[in-house]
Amino acid sequence: MKIVCYKDKILKAINSVVKAVASKTTMPILEGILIQTNDNEIKLTTYDLEIGIEYIMDCEVEEQGSTVVNAIMFSEIIRKLPDTEIKIYLDTNNLLVIECEGSLYKLATMDPTEFPELPKINVENSIQIEQNVLKNMIRRTIFAVSNEENRPIFTGCLFCLLYTSPSPRDA
């Protein structure tokens, strides 16, 4: 695997997926980011067995491949690099090498085949909604959500889809 991308693009992707990294787990693979290449894009995936996030971004892919790297260490290194082009590749010892303007970092990797697959989503019963509409809906109802973990049923929001017809004859 060998990719070249700009810091701001990959940092945005990392910041998006790092929210689903397991903090306390007996499975070290869940503390990592799965990095996969496909043509001229990379896919970053995190999954803590409850929440999973995938982020696909365009970048220059020189060699195909995949790996898993510790999310916290990877994000901290990328965050501290200058705002320029970054080379990320696997060396012969299966270490993830990060190069940027004379800086060189090497991180241990994990076997990507051990990373759990995200569950398949049934797109048959899905809807599309604009981001600002969803945010507004959540903002107007979140005050009623409980912070107490002893009654987990009250710590979430129910999404209920109702179908309405504009025609009075359908009623």
Residue ranges and their predicted role:
Residues 49-53, 59-61, 104-106:
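Short, surface-exposed beta-strand-loop junctions and turns on beta-sheet-rich folds
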